[in-house]
A protein has these predicted regions:
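Structural motif
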Residues: 90, 115-117, 140
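Active-site-adjacent beta->alpha loops and helix N-cap segments on the catalytic face
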Residues: 93-106, 122-126, 142-149
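Short beta-strand/loop segments at the ligand-binding rim of alpha/beta enzyme cores
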Residues: 109-116, 152
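Conserved N-terminal beta1-alpha1 strand-loop-helix module at the mouth
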Residues: 1-112
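"…together with the soluble PPM/PP2C metallo-phosphatase catalytic core" -> "…together
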Residues: 129
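Glycine-rich phosphate-binding active-site loops on the catalytic face of alpha/beta enzymes
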Residues: 134-144
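Conserved small/polar residues in nucleotide/adenosyl-binding loops
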Residues: 150-157
């Protein structure tokens, strides 16, 4: 892993520990038993002439702030009107300025499938994605070594791709 990826993953582990202390995984699982209808990323990309995955991101570690007060209920509909097939929403707060609330804000405003883009290292995050309405999650291979996802149930079991 790169130095920045190591730093992000270390921070993500602490963040997830704090989240688990506030909201148990059992509670997330119970609230994910009746997930909202999912939108197929594969079907959307296959049917699209562009195949564009548009990304909602406020900042990046390398570039700094892109648009600090970008609103997830306003920008994603513009991406859809411009022809995007899928919407990728960064939910990492510390390094990218995102939040799970961004998926909740965008979902009712668009008909596109939504990809939760984050550093997924624990099945807890899959249940979070299910609850907020993500249709898929991004898995970064370099971040998956020695993580808890290897023992997780299939994402299809929870209706998240």
């Amino acid at each position: 892993m790169t130095d920045i990826l190591d730093e992000i993953i270390a921070h993500k582990r602490l963040e997830i520990e704090q989240q688990k202390a506030a909201i148990s995984q059992e509670l997330l699982i119970n609230n994910c038993n009746e997930p909202m209808p999912r939108r197929s990323m594969r079907a959307s990309l296959s049917a699209s002439p562009s195949g564009i995955i548009a990304e909602f991101k406020r900042r990046s570690p390398s570039k700094g702030w892109i648009k600090e007060n970008a609103q997830a209920d306003i920008i994603p509909p513009a991406y859809e009107m411009a022809g995007a097939s899928v919407l990728s929403i960064l939910t990492d707060e510390n390094f990218f300025g995102g939040n799970l609330k961004d998926i909740r804000a965008a979902r009712p405003q668009v008909s596109l499938p939504i990809l939760r883009k984050d550093f997924i290292i624990d099945e807890y995050q899959l249940y979070q994605a299910c609850i907020v309405g993500a249709d898929a999650v991004l898995l970064i291979a370099a971040a998956l070594r020695n993580c808890l996802l290897y023992t997780s149930p299939s994402p299809r079991d929870r209706s998240v791709s």
